C-alpha cells in the first residue's frame, strides 16, 4: 500500500490482465498506470490505523467497566486493601499514593527499566529499515517486512511471557523480564554479528527472536506496576512507569540517529545492546520482590 509500482513491468502487466485491458488500449493503460502508481494511497497508511484506533475507543466506552463490584461481581481473592479506604478523596488517599507509588522503590525500578525496554524496542521500530538496508544490505521492501515481523513476533512473545510468569514464576513478572532482557541482548548481539551477505532467513530469525524477547517486558511492566501498587493506585503507577517509557524516545530517536550518522551503525548496535543489558540489570534489582503489594494489606 502506497508503493509506486508503475516502474515494474510485471506489476503493470498483472494489473492490466486483472482488469482485462489490452496493451494497445491507451485509455485503459492510463488507468492501469494510475492504479500501479497508487496515487494518494499513502494517505490510507494514516486513515486505516486511525479508523482502527477510533473503533477501539468506541469499544472501550461501551464495554469497559470500572471494578468487579460495579457490575455485581465479588472482589478478586487476595486483592483486598482493607487498611486504607481509598474511596475517600482526601489526605488518606494521598497517603496511599505516596506509600504505594511515589515512595515505593519497586515502582521507580520498573519505571527506569521501562526506559531501557522502550529504547531497545523503538530503536528497531524507528530505525529498523535504515539499519537493515545500510548495515545488512537488505532492500527497503524486505526491511519493511522484517520490521513488521519483529512486531508480530513481539505479540507472540507477550503471550508467552505472561503464560510463563503464571506457570513457572508464581506471578513474579519482574523475574520474567530479567530473562526476556537477557534474551533480547543475546539476539541483538547475534544479529549484529551476522555478515551483510547472511541469508535473509537468518536475519529474519534473529531479529524476530529479539522482538519475541523485548515485547515481554513491555507488556509485563504495566502488570507488575499495577500489582505492586495494588488496584487502588494501579493507574497512577502505570502513568509513572509510562512516563519513563516515552521519555526514552529522546535516546532511541535522536540519540541513536546521531550515533549512527557520526560513528556508524556498529556503534549504534553497541548502544542498543548496552541498553538491553542495563535494562536487565535494573530488573535484577527487584529480583527478590514479591509478586504484588497486597499481602501487607490483607491482615
Question: Model regions: which residues?
Answer:
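Interfacial helix-cap and linker-helix signal at transmembrane-aqueous boundaries
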Residues: 1-14, 36-37, 132-133, 164-165, ...
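Extracytoplasmic gate region of multi-pass secondary transporters
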Residues: 3, 99-159, 218, 252-253
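Juxtamembrane intracellular "pre-TM" segments in multi-pass secondary transporters
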Residues: 71-109
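Paired intracellular helix-loop junctions of major facilitator superfamily
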Residues: 170, 225-234
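C-terminal ends and interior cores of transmembrane alpha-helices
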Residues: 182-196
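Symmetry-related core transmembrane helices of the 12-TM Major Facilitator Superfamily/SLC fold
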Residues: 43-62, 267-285
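Cytoplasmic membrane-interface "Motif A"-like loop-to-helix N-cap segments
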Residues: 166-181
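A late C-terminal transmembrane helix in Major Facilitator Superfamily
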Residues: 231-263
Amino acid at each position: 500500500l502506497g508503493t509506486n509500482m508503475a516502474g515494474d513491468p510485471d506489476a503493470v502487466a498483472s494489473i492490466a490482465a486483472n482488469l482485462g485491458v489490452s496493451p494497445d488500449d491507451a485509455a485503459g493503460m492510463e488507468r492501469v498506470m494510475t492504479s500501479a502508481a497508487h496515487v494518494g494511497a499513502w494517505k490510507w497508511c494514516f486513515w486505516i490505523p486511525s479508523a482502527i484506533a477510533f473503533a477501539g475507543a468506541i469499544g472501550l466506552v461501551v464495554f469497559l467497566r470500572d471494578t468487579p463490584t460495579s457490575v455485581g461481581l465479588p472482589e478478586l481473592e487476595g486483592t483486598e486493601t482493607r487498611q486504607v479506604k481509598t474511596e475517600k478523596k482526601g489526605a488518606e488517599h494521598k497517603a496511599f499514593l505516596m506509600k504505594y507509588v511515589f515512595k515505593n522503590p519497586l515502582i521507580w525500578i520498573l519505571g527506569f527499566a521501562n526506559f531501557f525496554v522502550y529504547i531497545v524496542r523503538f530503536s528497531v521500530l524507528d530505525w529498523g529499515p535504515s539499519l537493515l538496508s545500510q548495515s545488512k544490505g537488505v532492500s527497503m521492501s524486505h526491511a519493511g517486512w522484517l520490521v513488521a515481523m519483529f512486531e508480530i513476533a513481539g505479540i507472540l512473545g507477550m503471550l508467552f511471557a505472561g503464560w510463563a510468569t503464571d506457570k513457572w514464576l508464581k506471578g513474579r513478572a519482574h523475574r520474567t523480564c530479567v530473562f526476556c532482557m537477557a534474551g533480547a541482548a543475546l539476539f541483538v548481539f547475534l544479529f549484529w554479528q551476522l555478515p551483510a551477505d547472511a541469508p535473509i532467513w537468518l536475519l529474519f530469525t534473529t531479529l524476530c527472536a529479539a522482538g519475541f524477547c523485548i515485547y515481554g517486558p513491555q507488556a509485563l511492566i504495566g502488570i507488575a506496576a499495577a500489582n505492586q501498587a495494588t488496584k487502588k493506585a494501579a493507574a497512577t503507577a502505570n502513568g509513572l512507569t509510562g512516563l519513563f517509557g516515552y521519555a526514552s524516545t529522546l535516546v532511541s530517536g535522536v540519540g541513536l540517529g546521531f550515533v549512527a550518522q557520526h560513528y556508524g551503525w556498529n556503534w549504534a548496535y553497541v548502544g542498543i545492546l548496552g541498553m538491553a543489558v542495563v535494562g536487565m540489570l535494573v530488573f535484577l534489582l527487584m529480583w527478590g520482590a514479591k509478586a504484588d503489594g497486597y499481602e501487607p494489606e490483607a491482615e
